[in-house]
A protein has these predicted regions:
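A short, ordered amphipathic alpha-helix with a cationic face
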Residues: 12-17, 32, 52-57, 69, ...
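Short alpha-helical linear motifs
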Residues: 103-107, 141-142
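Ferredoxin-type iron-sulfur electron-transfer modules in oxidoreductases and energy-metabolism complexes
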Residues: 23-41, 63-95, 99, 110-140
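Non-ligating segments of multi-cofactor redox enzymes
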Residues: 1-29, 36-43, 47, 117
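Short cysteine clusters
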Residues: 46-49, 54, 58, 93-97, ...
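Conserved small/polar residues in nucleotide/adenosyl-binding loops
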Residues: 144-146
């Protein structure tokens, strides 16, 4: 774990919503992007619990403390690899999932939970921007067309 006191030093922050009149004219994200520094602070709030209930709260069993730690340490490439270890489509699930992992976060017992959903979305966005996500082609040619 990168910062053992991150959850004490930093409160939960969420990205700002874009104004509704602006959002009505495009199909872009509802929230403004987080800065890298703000996201690292949020990732540092992960307590690396002995039994991380966020993993059990996630329907996919994502290794949430692992990629929170990697984001805190600025190891984005390893973070997307850790995310892809349990989730083939984080670009969809990160946005559509209602984040039961945040409800299961141990920090959420006494304070606001870690912003797990936002960290996941930002990992994926960074991976797309850096060109780390590439299509995986089938090894065997099937004659089935979609």
């Amino acid at each position: 774990m990168g910062d053992p006191r991150g959850f004490i030093r930093h409160g939960r922050e969420m990205p700002k919503r874009r104004p509704v009149p602006v959002r009505l004219r495009d199909w872009k994200e509802v929230y403004e992007p987080f800065s890298g520094e703000a996201l690292q602070k949020q990732a540092s709030r992960c307590m690396d619990c002995g039994i991380p209930f966020c993993n059990n709260g996630c329907p996919l069993g994502n290794l949430i403390p692992d990629w929170n730690d990697l984001v805190y340490k600025n190891n984005w490439r390893e973070a997307i690899d850790a995310l892809h270890a349990t989730n083939n489509f984080p670009e969809f699930t990160g946005r559509l999932c209602p984040a039961p992992c945040e409800a299961a976060c141990v920090l959420g017992i006494h304070e606001d939970p870690v912003t797990i959903k936002q960290v996941e979305v930002e990992i994926v966005e960074r991976a797309w921007n850096e060109g780390w996500i590439k299509p995986v082609l089938a090894h065997k040619l099937s004659l089935i067309h979609i």
